[in-house]
């Protein structure tokens, strides 16, 4: 009985090479496939605006670029009150010698 159970386990187990041989068939690269996999930034922008109803309505009136900018534009998020940044004049400068003239 124990020898039969070992045979079944051997049949069910596939090595990594054997599994990859039938799971992924090699094919030549096709530039049309990459268009389906990766969306352009404009397409991602359009989809994000379509999902938010006010942005979609405004996009019909003034255009996608302006509508997206109004609702999802580059707005700085406010830091949390617990980790407030010091005022700019007291922050460490990235370029410490910026005040010297050469």
From Swiss-Prot:
One of its GO terms (cellular component) is extracellular matrix. The keyword Transport does not apply. Requires vitamin K-dependent gamma-carboxylation for its function. Accounts for 35-40% of the total protein in the acid demineralization extract of calcified cartilage. The keyword Transcription regulation does not apply. Its main location: secreted. The modification 4-carboxyglutamate is found at residues 43, 47, 50-51. Keywords: Chondrogenesis, Developmental protein, Differentiation, Disulfide bond, Gamma-carboxyglutamic acid, Osteogenesis, Phosphoprotein, Secreted. Residues 18-45, 72-102 are annotated as: Disordered. Residues 27-73 form the Gla domain. Disulfide bonds join 49-55. InterPro entries: GLA-like_dom_SF, GLA_domain, MGP. It is found in: Secreted. One of its GO terms (biological process) is cartilage development. The modification Phosphoserine is found at residues 2-3, 5. Residues 85-102 have a biased composition (Basic residues). Residues 30-45 have a biased composition (Basic and acidic residues). GO terms for molecular function: calcium ion binding. Associates with the organic matrix of calcified cartilage. Belongs to the osteocalcin/matrix Gla protein family. This is Matrix Gla protein. The gene is mgp.
């Amino acid at each position: 009985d124990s020898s039969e159970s070992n045979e079944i386990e051997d049949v069910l187990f596939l090595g990594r090479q054997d599994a990859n041989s039938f799971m992924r068939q090699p094919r030549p690269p096709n530039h049309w496939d990459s268009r389906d996999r990766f969306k352009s930034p404009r397409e991602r922008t359009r989809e994000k605006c379509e999902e938010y109803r006010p942005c979609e309505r405004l996009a019909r009136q003034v255009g996608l670029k302006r509508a997206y900018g109004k609702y999802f534009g580059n707005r700085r998020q406010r830091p949390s009150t617990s980790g407030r940044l010091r005022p700019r004049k007291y922050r460490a400068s990235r370029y410490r010698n910026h005040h010297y003239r050469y």
